[in-house]
Amino acid sequence: MGQEKLYTEKELSWLSFNERVLQEAADKSNPLIERMRFLGIYSNNLDEFYKVRFADLKRRILINEEQGSAVTSRHLLKKIQSKVVKADQEFDGLYNDLLLEMARNQIFLVNERQISENQQTWLKQYFKQHLRQHITPILINHDTNLVQFLKDDYTYLAVEIIRGQDIAYALLEIPSDKIPRFVNLPPEAPRRRKPMILLDNILRFCLDEIFKGFFDYDALNAYSMKMTRDAEYDLVTEMESSLLELMSSSLKQRLTAEPVRFVYQRDMPDEMVELLRNKLGISNDDSVIAGGRYHNFKDFINFPNVGKSNLVNRPMPRLRHVWFDKFRNGFDAIREQDVLLYYPYHTFEHVLELLRQASFDPSVLAIKINIYRVAKDSRIIDSMIHAAHNGKKVTVVVELQARFDEEANIHWAKSLTAAGVHVIFSAPGLKIHAKLFLISRLENDEIVRYAHIGTGNFNEKTARIYTDYSLLTADARITNEVRRVFNFIENPYRPVTFDNLMVSPQNSRLILYQLIDQEIIHAQAGESAGITLKINNLVDKGLVDRLYSASSAGVKIRLLVRGMCSLIPNMPGISDNIQVTSIVDRFLEHDRVYVFENKGDKLVYLSSADWMTRNIDYRIEVAVSLLDPKLKQRVLDILEILFNDTVKARYIDKELSNRYVPRGNRRKVRAQIAIYDYLKALEQPEQ
């Protein structure tokens, strides 16, 4: 069988994942406002796809053209464009349907032609008080270089300034980074109506306020547009430049990086479309999409809570881990037994509080932590600064190459350094994606270490919407190896060995191959054999091939893959024993769990790494084997709930059909709700 039939192209698989997000917007069992927010998530995801995946494909086409072999990549490009256009049409239909449903619930998202005289007066005043100072027209003439100063993924209004037979053009940036995209209008009778207007439409309504007195014109017409740039870097390793300087210049480069997508309002005049395409240097390989009146739907992720309470998800208050309530401080609790937290069901407050305590505890000598993506107002960063002020030896490993968070991380690195924190940057080309901290504490004249190993970032915001595990432990078998990981980060080319941790790029591929091969041996011997994986992405061909081999040997394999999946299940003789499902629901499934049957004595790993080549071979990632039988069983219980979902689970198949898993005669199980109930029962205080 040819290779092209053994794997799904990762780009098409990624788009299929985003179609599952669109399914959530279409799902009438979801609350109305949550459905509108899923449209925002879909749009945000698609922006990232073009910045990264599509841009990467464009580069491959350029490379292949030089080698005379770009046909396959161009064919994939056409498939992508066709798939996106089809999904966008569905998106537009869903948006219009949701507007009608909103109106039935007395929520009205109006345009500039649907407002009353009182609202018109109010809007002009609002424009003068809040908006005008943020609006400066960009006049388009022969010398205008739009590529240089148009911002990535901002929405602009392209304005026709018409006087007789003459037409001039200008652009207005919609300042949604400074003013809320949704503006509540004064209500009209009946008072229960809740009218809102988009910032875009306020600008359309106030065009005269912007141009009058500066231009002579007979008419002004405005059309929306946006541009997406290539988000990858040209990271050349200049030994005389520090990584911080290199990243800063890379960020500047992104501001002038090549456009990869141009989206414009469908009724924009052809002459204007051509002018903008030429000014932006949009090639035939770039994605040019005629869209609706509004772009940057990602702002709809924050669609306001208006109307009745049943229009949004019912609250799920985050759970406290009752074990911490039994002790004076977090260290006593963790020293007594390992603690496993599962967000967003558990509160992230336990981790924040532990680091706060460490910042002033006289017994704490040193803290080491790595940050990849932290919250905008990070309490973790504050704790590290306070710890340094309190005389602790604080080391923070800052990943400057965390895509889309580089600017924030550069800022944090400078703030930490100014506070006396020892800041370390990763080596160029070796991202640190592990989620670790290590606290060294003097207890009875001995140093006791406390470690955190997680699947997600130290981020208060994402911990409310991403599912992730945190293992907190004082077990020396693990803490000593976490210490070795930090030593490896500081000296990345020095050999180091691990027994209880799987560490990329050191040993992950080797260990994973060995674990899969061991299951093959067990299956061939007629013993209990199986593999269960929960990951975000599965696209590494070496690991996919190993899973195919295991399936062919009779190993039962269950995969829960949220995003990209190159593996094709149910191919006769190749993947008959592999089942792949995906869950998209109110929380983003983000944790990575690997389970190997091991003849009944299951091995359970929590990991920061997806099964992608970059994560296995080119990043620092950490997976930990759970040693506590109770915690191991808890993770296995949660996995069983996920694999028994009958509401939000879809099959991943060769056709990328996203068919829902049929319920049949099984009971209704919505996994995320069931997991919350399961953990809530465990966390009830003892009577």
Curated annotation (Swiss-Prot):
Matching PANTHER family, A to Z?
A: POLYPHOSPHATE KINASE
Q: What top-tier enzyme class does this entry carry? A: transferase
What family is this protein classified in?
Belongs to the polyphosphate kinase 1 (PPK1) family.
GO cellular component terms, semicolon-separated: membrane; polyphosphate kinase complex
Q: Which HAMAP family match?
A: Polyphosphate_kinase
What is the superkingdom listed in this entry's lineage? Answer: Bacteria
* Record gene name: ppk
The protein's role, per its UniProt record: Catalyzes the reversible transfer of the terminal phosphate of ATP to form a long-chain polyphosphate (polyP).
Reactions catalysed, as given in the entry: [phosphate](n) + ATP = [phosphate](n+1) + ADP
Which residues does the record give as ATP binding sites?
A: N45, Y466, R562, H590
PLD phosphodiesterase domain span: 585-615
Could you tell me what this protein is called?
A: Polyphosphate kinase
